[in-house]
Amino acid sequence: MKVSVVGAGVIGLATALTLADRGHTVTIYDPNPAKGASYHAGGMLAPTAEVVYKQEPLFPLMQAAAAWYPELIDLTRRYTDKPTGYRTDGTLVVAGDRADSTHLDQLRAYQHMHGMEVERLTTRQARGLEPALSPALAGAVAIDGDHQLQPRAFTLALIDAARNAAVSLRTQQVHDVGTLDADQVVLAAGLGAANVTGWYAGAAPLALRPVYGDILHLRVPEHQYPLLTRVIRGFVRDRAV
């Protein structure tokens, strides 16, 4: 089967590689491969830590996506030696004060209610795992199933793997999927999907909006490296960090 994939971020590249590995003829389109949301992502694979109240329909999808990553990493490594930055050290979520610790307990109860594994730790246990944490923390939980990778490294690895799997990568913009020579089209263009036509009738069916965040890159002095091994998340004055 001939498949066209629109969008060369993590989702589009992973889809293209998987389909090519299964014997399909795949072409992927993106004017700037791996330079969109995937380039700016933090790399947390956190279906449990990123749970938000009243978004229950998303939870099975989040869990299934995270569970697929080991298989995807193995598939990528079959086609390339480039690093992915994939790590399975787990995640700690910490609380800055007593109110934040209460919030953490309430969220943990909600996560347990939905079948997610979250372990309450003492602050001493948390600092035993990550000595760089402050002794003034009010609480902590461990989420061993929430992992991490380096998005920029991973997308470059996926591009190399896809090419080695005979995926054709075309650096061009697709405005209308009806112009593509394909038996099936996969639309994986993120926010750009709202500007692609040819797959619906009437008004555009997707009401997409960006989610804003800040990322600060810090250089760790060699004598302190590695400063941390796990992903550290937290609640500080009732704000997620």
Question: What kind of region is each of these model predictions?
Answer:
Residues 2-27:
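N-terminal Rossmann-like FAD-binding beta1-loop-alpha1 element of flavoenzymes
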Residues 11, 34, 192:
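Conserved Rossmann-like nucleotide-cofactor binding loop
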Residues 17-22, 31, 44, 82-87, ...:
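Active-site substrate-recognition segment that forms the wall
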Residues 22-24, 114, 161, 165:
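Conserved dinucleotide-binding and phosphotransfer motif residues
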Residues 30, 122-123, 169-173:
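Short loop/edge segments at beta-strand edges and connector loops
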Residues 36-40:
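N-terminal glycine-rich anion-binding loops that anchor highly charged ligand groups
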Residues 44-125, 233:
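Dinucleotide-binding Rossmann-like beta1-alpha1 core, especially the glycine-rich loop
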Residues 140-177, 182-184, 188, 192-195:
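Helical element adjacent to the flavin cofactor pocket in flavoenzyme catalytic cores
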